[in-house]
Every structure is written in C-alpha cells, then in structure tokens.
C-alpha cells in the first residue's frame, strides 16, 4: 500500500463541454503556460490530445498577435 494517493487527471475542456478553445481567452491560456511561457504538456495537465492540439494552436496564435509574450521578461 502506497503512502500517497495520486488524484486522477481529467480534461477540463471535456468536463465543461468546450467545442473550441478561443485564442482570445487569455485567462484560460495562461493556466496552461509555465512561468517561462512554455506550453505545459498534456501528461501533466490531463488534457485530451484533441484539446491539447487546439490549445497549442491557440497559444501560438495569441503569441503571434502579441496578446501573450513568447517568453518571460528578461533583465538584460
């Protein structure tokens, strides 16, 4: 018997019944980015592959339109 109980991951988008991920929904997109600006993998978040692909496309679109930065702020 193990000491730790690992909670089962679930896809938030499937649970909420989302059809498509919007690139303008910055609050949702930021939940799936690290503090450095990288996209968090689906094995960590539990997102299904269909929504992970949509998420990656939405993040890349919003980066291109300068809605979110490509990386964190650098001190040069």
From Swiss-Prot:
Record-annotated membrane-spanning stretches: none
GO biological process: translation
Cellular component GO terms, alphabetical: cytosolic small ribosomal subunit
Single GO MF descriptor: structural constituent of ribosome
Keywords, alphabetical: Ribonucleoprotein, Ribosomal protein, RNA-binding, rRNA-binding
Tree of life domain: Bacteria
Function: Binds as a heterodimer with protein bS6 to the central domain of the 16S rRNA, where it helps stabilize the platform of the 30S subunit.
Similarity section: Belongs to the bacterial ribosomal protein bS18 family.
Description of how the protein assembles with itself and partners: Part of the 30S ribosomal subunit. Forms a tight heterodimer with protein bS6.
PANTHER family named in the record: 30S RIBOSOMAL PROTEIN S18, SMALL RIBOSOMAL SUBUNIT PROTEIN BS18M
Entry protein name: Small ribosomal subunit protein bS18
Lineage summary: Bacteria, Pseudomonadati, Pseudomonadota, Gammaproteobacteria, Lysobacterales
Gene that produces this protein: rpsR
């Amino acid at each position: 018997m193990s000491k730790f109980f690992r909670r089962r991951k679930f896809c938030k988008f499937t649970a909420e019944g989302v059809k498509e991920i919007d690139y303008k929904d910055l609050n949702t997109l930021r939940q799936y980015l690290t503090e450095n600006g990288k996209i968090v993998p689906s094995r960590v978040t539990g997102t299904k592959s269909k929504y992970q692909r949509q998420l990656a496309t939405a993040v890349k679109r919003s980066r291109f339109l300068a809605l979110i930065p490509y990386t964190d702020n650098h001190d040069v």
